[in-house]
């Protein structure tokens, strides 16, 4: 989120009759991925993004993915990369500081396949 972590607008929450609360804060997350260029421009990259809270533990806040795959309804295709596969995994971790307290996160893995046409036409063929 560009290093700005404050949400500067009020957002509503959904409250279920069971007491379950859903909050969807407006945010755009940006991440980076270490690129391995051994097979460039015919490479694929495995990038991950971990979402969780370190402020509240798993006894206070429960987070769960809606399904095994993230929602890509706002995904925009790229001319350089194709999304080959993507998955989300739920984790409960007990750190050495507090072994009886679980901390929850969801880690999303994205496998990106480089589309090599640009590099073939502009870099490889002219050589």
From Swiss-Prot:
Gene name of the encoded protein: CHRNA1
Reactions catalysed according to its record = K(+)(in) = K(+)(out); Na(+)(in) = Na(+)(out)
Q: Please tell me where this protein is predominantly located.
A: membrane
Q: What is this protein called?
A: Acetylcholine receptor subunit alpha
Return one GO MF term. transmembrane signaling receptor activity
Q: What are its GO cellular component terms?
A: postsynaptic membrane
Subunit note: One of the alpha chains that assemble within the acetylcholine receptor, a pentamer of two alpha chains, a beta, a delta, and a gamma or epsilon chains.
Membrane topology annotation:
Multi-pass membrane protein
Disulfide-bonded cysteine pairs: these are: 33-47, 97-98
Establish whether keyword Transport is in the entry: yes
Carbohydrate attachment residues: 46, 94
Q: What species was this sequence derived from?
A: Natrix tessellata
Site annotated as Confers toxin resistance: where? 92, 94, 99
Provide the membrane-side ranges marked Extracellular in the record: 1-127
Where in or outside the cell is it found?
Postsynaptic cell membrane; Cell membrane
Question: Briefly, what is this protein's role?
Answer: Upon acetylcholine binding, the AChR responds by an extensive change in conformation that affects all subunits and leads to opening of an ion-conducting channel across the plasma membrane. Does not bind alpha-bungarotoxin.
**Family, per the entry?**
Belongs to the ligand-gated ion channel (TC 1.A.9) family. Acetylcholine receptor (TC 1.A.9.1) subfamily. Alpha-1/CHRNA1 sub-subfamily.
Q: Which UniProt keywords apply?
A: Cell membrane, Disulfide bond, Glycoprotein, Ion channel, Ion transport, Ligand-gated ion channel, Membrane, Postsynaptic cell membrane, Receptor, Synapse, Transport
InterPro entries documented for this protein: Neur_chan_lig-bd, Neur_chan_lig-bd_sf, Neur_channel, Neurotransmitter_ion_chnl_CS
């Amino acid at each position: 989120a560009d290093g700005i972590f404050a949400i500067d607008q009020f957002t509503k929450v959904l409250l279920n009759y069971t007491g379950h609360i859903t909050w969807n804060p407006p945010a755009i997350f940006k991440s980076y991925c270490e690129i391995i260029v051994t097979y460039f421009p015919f490479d694929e990259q495995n990038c991950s993004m971990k979402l969780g809270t370190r402020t509240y533990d798993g006894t206070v806040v429960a987070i769960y993915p809606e399904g095994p795959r993230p929602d890509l309804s706002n995904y925009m295709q790229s001319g350089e990369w194709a999304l080959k596969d993507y998955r989300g995994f739920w984790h409960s971790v007990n750190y050495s500081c507090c072994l009886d307290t679980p901390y929850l996160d969801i880690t999303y893995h994205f496998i990106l396949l480089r589309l090599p046409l640009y590099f073939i036409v502009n870099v490889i063929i002219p050589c």
